[in-house]
């Protein structure tokens, strides 16, 4: 009998409960990650949408930066959605002025991401998004979304909106500018589950 897949969701701030619900609907055991010890035994970790500067500060407070890097180095998959994509990126553009334009990140994925590229919260929108590998469009919800302005050679672009990159994969890393957890469509969570099981096998 196969073991139940075990994934984590960073649960410091943002839409972590919605991610948990999507994963549990796929039969996944889910741990809410708040401290380094919570990473033990996980096959993948989702960095949710929220406020990237707040999540970054809390990651510092809870000592999570290096443990998450180590988790990935040991074979764990990572998926950043919206603010989480910012935290994965090697380069963050448009950082908060109060921090001199600097935005802390894990710097694991060869991307340049611009914060809040799609505007303010009142500019939120939902579009049917053509995603490479999916037979039908995905209902993508954008809320003050970032945009991926540059990708490195090892990064696969999976989706664009109005010509701008909004979903990309680099090995065991997945970054989405939108919020897949805010729709009942399970296909991207299923993709991340497959990534997590493949890399940890």
Curated annotation (Swiss-Prot):
Residues reported to bind L-glutamine: 50-52, 115, 143-144
Lyase is among the record's keywords: yes
A single GO molecular function term of this UniProt record: pyridoxal 5'-phosphate synthase (glutamine hydrolysing) activity
UniProt pathway: Cofactor biosynthesis; pyridoxal 5'-phosphate biosynthesis
One protein family per Pfam: SNO
Any one GO CC term of the record: cytosol
Keyword entries, A-Z: Glutamine amidotransferase, Hydrolase, Lyase, Pyridoxal phosphate
UniProt KW Hydrolase keyword: yes
Active site: 82, 179, 181
EC number: 4.3.3.6, 3.5.1.2
Catalysed reactions, as listed in the record: aldehydo-D-ribose 5-phosphate + D-glyceraldehyde 3-phosphate + L-glutamine = pyridoxal 5'-phosphate + L-glutamate + phosphate + 3 H2O + H(+); L-glutamine + H2O = L-glutamate + NH4(+)
Alphabetical list of NCBIfam families matching this protein: PLP_synth_Pdx2
Protein role: Catalyzes the hydrolysis of glutamine to glutamate and ammonia as part of the biosynthesis of pyridoxal 5'-phosphate. The resulting ammonia molecule is channeled to the active site of PdxS.
The protein, known as: Pyridoxal 5'-phosphate synthase subunit PdxT
Organism name: Deinococcus geothermalis (strain DSM 11300 / CIP 105573 / AG-3a)
């Amino acid at each position: 009998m196969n073991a139940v897949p075990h994934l984590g969701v960073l649960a410091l701030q943002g839409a972590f409960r919605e991610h948990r619900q999507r994963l549990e609907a796929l039969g996944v055991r889910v741990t809410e990650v708040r401290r380094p010890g919570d990473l033990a035994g996980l096959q993948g970790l989702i960095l949710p949408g929220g406020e990237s500067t707040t999540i970054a500060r809390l990651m510092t407070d809870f000592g999570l930066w290096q443990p998450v890097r180590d988790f990935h180095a040991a074979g764990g998959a990572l998926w950043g959605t919206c603010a989480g994509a910012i935290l994965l990126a090697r380069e963050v553009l448009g950082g908060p002025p109060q921090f001199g334009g600097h935005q802390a990140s894990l710097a694991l994925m060869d991307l340049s991401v611009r914060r809040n590229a799609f505007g303010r919260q009142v500019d939120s929108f939902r579009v049917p998004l053509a995603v490479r590998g999916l037979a039908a469009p995905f209902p993508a919800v954008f809320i003050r979304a970032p945009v991926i302005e540059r990708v490195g050679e090892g990064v696969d672009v999976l989706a664009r909106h109005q010509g701008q990159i909004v979903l990309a994969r680099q090995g065991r890393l997945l970054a989405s500018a939108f919020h897949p957890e805010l729709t009942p469509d399970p296909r991207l969570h299923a993709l991340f589950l497959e990534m997590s099981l493949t890399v940890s096998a």
